[in-house]
Curated annotation (Swiss-Prot):
F-type ATPases have 2 components, CF(1) - the catalytic core - and CF(0) - the membrane proton channel. CF(1) has five subunits: alpha(3), beta(3), gamma(1), delta(1), epsilon(1). CF(0) has three main subunits: a(1), b(2) and c(9-12). The alpha and beta chains form an alternating ring which encloses part of the gamma chain. CF(1) is attached to CF(0) by a central stalk formed by the gamma and epsilon chains, while a peripheral stalk is formed by the delta and b chains. Keywords: ATP synthesis, ATP-binding, Cell inner membrane, Cell membrane, CF(1), Hydrogen ion transport, Ion transport, Membrane, Nucleotide-binding, Translocase, Transport. The lineage of its organism: Bacteria, Pseudomonadati, Pseudomonadota, Alphaproteobacteria, Hyphomicrobiales. Its main location: membrane. It is a peripheral membrane protein. One of its GO terms (cellular component) is plasma membrane. It is found in: Cell inner membrane. Belongs to the ATPase alpha/beta chains family. This is ATP synthase subunit alpha.
Length: 510
């Protein structure tokens, strides 16, 4: 046997080169323990925070806790079939969802999978659910109105495109009803052939609600013809906590597609209290230290990074916008609890709904004194500013006097007049569900209220007067409504014509 020196040196070199190279346990891990929707996984050394991983049975999860010797994974689905010792694969992708127009008219879960039985989603693009919000430079101040069709809100607490306005109140105070009316009111803007700058696409995120409630909501959207410009993201009460935590982020990513492409979108998170509860559950199971009310320390950051993504972009960035209406449920009207105060401080104002008002029949049950819109007034059209400026002051005076009036019966004429006017304005701001009003119709109705046309009417005739007057305006004075809509202000001529129309109608109504 011939031994060549060159061969020996080559073998030795190869062995020296490979010396000390152990096999890396990085791309595949092993389940150490599993329970309560959380898996502890050994291995996966190079996994990224927020990365999607896949278990042996195809169930997916998200790596949240990266510790020295193991990874804490939250499971998107049931953990029943996951057992100790099973393998876990990295996917290499951060959690993302499909986005685009293909989602309009569909109901999806928090991962963007269709749950409405209408076949697969036709999406051309996928986006990460958790991305950084736009910085200061790409933004522009809010200046275009986002009409909800509700007089109490559009007149007193106006919302602009790109604003974050919180809807807060106890259970059963009509929070979802306000959000639903806001979606339905966008129908005239989303007609075929309308310019993109006018349209407003809607994303509704249902977190921790009953399936029957979500089904009812979708049915209403369908019946009213609003589903075609809406996306519904549902993580219901029976879904695992990670899905409820993820749904608002997924919905925001879908809304951002429109914002970043020069279009306008509205996202409604219904509701963020349930998302916070789901996040608390996940955090405690992952053994993160609890803080106030057992919420983790970063629950403020959870909501701030979510809501900061709603923005109005400047013209260089396409001038798109994403408006957010987060919903928070309070317990016994306690606005000073942890999550409500957090979200109030993040948003640009709040619409405060009160159960007492709701039971008095004032619906929408907006407490005008506690509700504010910090940026919306610059988005309000001039015509509405002209008529609504008065109503706010008069209602504030009315509330103050109404408290005193309970104690004394001998009131002077001016006080009596103010109380009279306030009661009628309160009556005027009532509105039935599914009957949103166009902004020009709101303007003429509020003009009638602030100019004394309702003062001598019995309270129970105010709604009747309003309905009759609107019918008269639509049938005989449509040109005046069109003028207000196009010019967006009440000129001297418009005011003269409106006064004439009101005088004529008031005579015939009496």
């Amino acid at each position: 046997m011939d031994i060549r020196a060159a061969e020996i040196s080559a073998i030795l070199k190869e062995q020296i080169q490979n010396f000390g190279r152990e096999a890396e346990v990085s791309e595949v891990g092993q389940v150490l323990s599993v329970g309560d929707g959380i898996a502890r996984v050994y291995g996966l050394d190079n996994v990224q925070a927020g990365e999607m991983v896949e278990f042996e049975n195809g169930t997916r999860g998200m790596a949240l806790n990266l510790e020295i010797d193991n990874v804490g994974v939250v499971i998107f689905g049931s953990d029943r079939d996951i057992k100790e010792g099973q393998t876990v694969k990295r996917t290499g992708a951060i959690v993302d969802v499909p986005v685009g127009r293909g989602l309009l008219g569909r109901v999806v879960d928090a991962l963007g999978n269709p749950i409405d039985g209408k076949g697969p989603i036709e999406a051309t693009e996928r986006r990460r659910v958790d991305v950084k919000a736009p910085g200061i430079i790409p933004r522009k101040s809010v200046h275009e109105p986002m009409q909800t069709g509700l007089k109490a809100i559009d007149a007193l607490i106006p919302i602009g495109r790109g604003q974050r306005e919180l809807i807060i109140g106890d259970r059963q105070t009509g929070k979802t009803a306000v959000a639903l009316d806001a979606i339905l009111n966008q129908k005239p803007l989303n007609v075929a052939g309308a310019p993109e700058s006018q349209k407003l696409y809607c994303v509704y995120v249902a977190v921790g609600q009953k399936r029957s409630t979500v089904a009812q909501f979708v049915k209403v959207l369908e019946e009213q013809g609003a589903l075609e410009y809406s996306i519904v993201v549902a993580a219901t009460a029976s879904d695992p906590a990670p899905m409820q935590f993820l749904a608002p982020f997924a919905g925001t990513a879908m809304g951002e597609y429109f914002r970043d492409n020069g279009m306008h979108a509205l996202i409604i998170h219904d509701d963020l209290s349930k998302q916070a509860v789901a996040y608390r559950q996940m955090s405690l199971l992952l053994r993160r230290p609890p803080g106030r009310e057992a919420y983790p320390g970063d629950v403020f950051y959870l909501h701030s990074r979510l809501l900061e993504r709603a923005a109005k972009l400047n013209d260089e960035n396409g001038a798109g916008s994403l408006t957010a209406l987060p919903v928070i449920e309070t317990q016994a009207n306690d606005v000073s609890a942890y999550i409500p105060t957090n979200v109030i401080s993040i948003t640009d104002g709040q619409i405060f709904l009160e159960s007492d008002l709701f039971y008095q029949g004032i619906r929408p049950a907006v407490n005008v004194g506690l509700s504010v819109s910090r940026v919306g007034s610059s988005a309000q059209i001039k015509a509405m500013k002209q008529v609504a400026g008065k109503i706010k002051g008069e209602l504030a005076q009315y509330r103050e006097l109404a408290a005193f009036a309970q104690f004394g019966s001998d009131l002077d004429a001016s006080t009596q007049k103010l109380l009279n006017r306030g009661a009628r304005l309160t009556e005027l701001l009532k509105q039935s569900q599914f009957s949103p009003l166009k902004v020009e119709e709101q303007v003429v109705v509020i003009y009638a209220g602030t100019n004394g046309y309702l003062d001598n009417l019995p309270l129970n005739k105010v709604r009747e007067f309003e309905a009759g007057f609107l019918l008269a305006m639509r049938t005989q004075h449509q040109d005046l409504l069109d003028t207000i809509r196009t010019s967006k202000e009440l000129s001297k001529d418009s005011i003269a014509n409106l006064t004439k129309a009101l005088d004529a109608f008031a005579k015939s109504f009496a």
